[in-house]
Amino acid sequence: MDWILKVEELAKHFRLHTQGGIRIPVFEALNLELCPGESAAVCGPSGAGKSSLLRLVYGNYRIGAGAIRVRHRDRVVNLAEASSDEILDLRRWTVGYVSQFLRVIPRVPALDIVMEPLRQRGGDPAEARRRAESLLDQLRIPERLWSLSPTTFSGGEQQRINIARGFAAFYPLMLLDEPTASLDPVNRRTVLDLISAARQQGAAILSIFHDAGDRRATTSRTIDLAMAPEAAEQPFRYEGRSASQAADRVP
């Protein structure tokens, strides 16, 4: 099967200009491939570069060396060479991202935030609204809050708005940075089922989970950034159960 994401000899470092120009290496010569329907979890200790990898794939960070290639519609885009317009088009149609924290313009209603990815694609406004309302209902956001800005919501409510926005449209490649971290068990199972459904539709998923049960319930292999590149990928069995069933059986 052809890959949707291919990372080749990727290197990244940060330079702290306020600290005398100290160079902080993140990773060197990182390689990975992800195919449609696959789900890989990025693992490693704090500071290993897990979130940085997702931000690099999303185009938030500049690539130090190597390549990040994404199959985008009828061509392959290398993020190391992509223009700003190409990156924006990738985000609109191919690469979805659920970050750790919700970042939105104040005063924009929660319903409009969830609808926005579908609006950007020029779809039917009524269908976009139905999809957004369905996700908000699934994620147990009370209807009385839909017309309010989520900047006033609790942390868990904000994360559910973030997840609803991330899953409103279908993306061939999804990046999930701790999507269940601040959720109660019931909403966590709902999110795991959304991830499972996206995989069944053919989405490739690159994720970060600190909860081992959630990780096993939704992923087929791990990428350990703390290990040598040749030993980075560690498989574990994916039994094809629904995500909530799998989560219930993981210690």
Regions found by a protein language model. Give the residues of each.
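Conserved structural motif at the start of ABC-family nucleotide-binding domains
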Residues: 5, 27-29, 90
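Helix-to-loop junction immediately C-terminal to a conserved catalytic motif
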Residues: 58
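ABC ATPase NBD coupling module
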Residues: 75-96
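Q-loop/switch helix immediately C-terminal to the Walker
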Residues: 101, 108-119
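Conserved ABC ATPase "signature" region
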Residues: 126-144
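Conserved ABC ATPase signature
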Residues: 149-153, 157
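ABC ATPase C-loop
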Residues: 166-167
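Catalytic Walker B motif of ABC-type/P-loop ATPase nucleotide-binding domains
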Residues: 174-177
